[in-house]
């Protein structure tokens, strides 16, 4: 069974790019634009990795990450923050919020794929 990545991203173009890159690398994707749905989807699908946009309309991606990490059944799933925040201190704040890794937008495609594979291995 292929490994899966849940993408939590409200921007349609970013969602399509991330989905295309991840699926082209041989992984399955579960997608939502709504941070409030992320917890239920994670429980239902048990993804191997979660890509989390930090700036979501309903609730911050860091808040969603906190909920995931507070859940005994989901806390083991690595969360990679994908965000336009690129100021000094942002990466540290994001890692302290529970994210295992951080990718800044606009993404570097090779680095994006390399980061995904570092958590999932080859598909």
From Swiss-Prot:
A single GO cellular-component term on record: cytoplasm
GO molecular function, one term: DNA binding
Residues that bear 4-aspartylphosphate: 53
Lineage top rank: taxon: Bacteria
Start and end residues of each Response regulatory domain: 4-120
InterPro entries: Bact_response_regulator (IPR050595), CheY-like_superfamily (IPR011006), Sig_transdc_resp-reg_receiver (IPR001789)
Record-annotated disulphide pairs: none
Pfam assignment, any one: Response_reg
GO process terms (BP): phosphorelay signal transduction system
This protein's UniProt keywords: Cytoplasm, DNA-binding, Phosphoprotein, Transcription, Transcription regulation, Two-component regulatory system
Main location: cytoplasm
Subcellular localization, as worded in the UniProt entry: Cytoplasm
Subunit: Interacts with DivL, PleC, DivJ and PdhS.
Purpose: Essential protein that is involved in the control of cell division, probably through the regulation of ctrA. Its phosphorylation status is regulated by PdhS.
Name of the protein this chain belongs to: Polar-differentiation response regulator DivK
Species classification: Bacteria, Pseudomonadati, Pseudomonadota, Alphaproteobacteria, Hyphomicrobiales
Gene name per UniProt: divK
